[in-house]
A protein has these predicted regions:
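Short aromatic/hydrophobic contact patches that present stacked aromatics
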Residues: 41-43, 83
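Anionic-ligand anchoring segments at beta-strand to alpha-helix junctions in alpha/beta enzyme folds, i.e.
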Residues: 60
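Long, contiguous binding/interaction regions
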Residues: 1-33, 50-57, 66, 75, ...
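Active-site neighborhood of thiol-dependent amide/isopeptide-bond enzymes
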Residues: 33-36, 41
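Short hydrophobic/aromatic beta-strand micro-patches
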Residues: 43-45, 94
Length: 145
């Protein structure tokens, strides 16, 4: 059985994993009624080229594990901007100066934009964590009488 993941769920997963990898100033831009390119842009900042490469590789791997393939990725070594294309969602990770320079938010100023907060986008639980959470509050069998 194949599961289709909706665009908003891919956006939410991408944002959660960006925060999980210490990205900053994460914003989503709703392009559903404005572009045929994709439904969402997700924009984020990072502190260094090393962090940029790490975030891109990690988010790509994390979403692949969730069943979301990357259609294309771009980021040359020493670059100040990287892109992950998940089809309906495109993730842009910038060094701060590059984000200000390219200003995609200004380019899409008429599109709804949302500044994401980490507490609104928790990382999904792994199966092991979910099993552990299911067991919380239960006495062990040793204590049954």
């Amino acid at each position: 059985m194949s599961t289709v993941i909706e665009a908003d769920e891919i956006r939410r997963l991408a944002i959660a994993h960006l925060f999980g990898r210490k990205a900053q100033s994460v914003t989503s831009v709703d392009l559903r009624d404005r572009s045929t390119l994709c439904d969402w842009f997700v924009l984020a900042n990072c502190q260094s080229d090393t962090q940029l490469q790490s975030i891109l590789a990690g988010v790509r791997r994390d979403l692949r594990k969730a069943g979301v393939p990357t259609l294309r990725s771009e980021c040359a070594a020493g670059s100040n901007w990287g892109v992950l294309d998940f089809g309906v969602v495109i993730v842009h990770v910038f060094l701060k100066d590059a984000r200000e320079h390219y200003s995609l938010e200004r380019l899409w100023k008429d599109a709804p934009q949302e500044e994401a907060r980490p507490e609104d986008f928790p990382l999904p639980k792994t199966e092991a964590q979910a099993d552990e959470a299911d067991d919380e509050g239960f006495e062990s069998e040793e204590n049954w009488t």
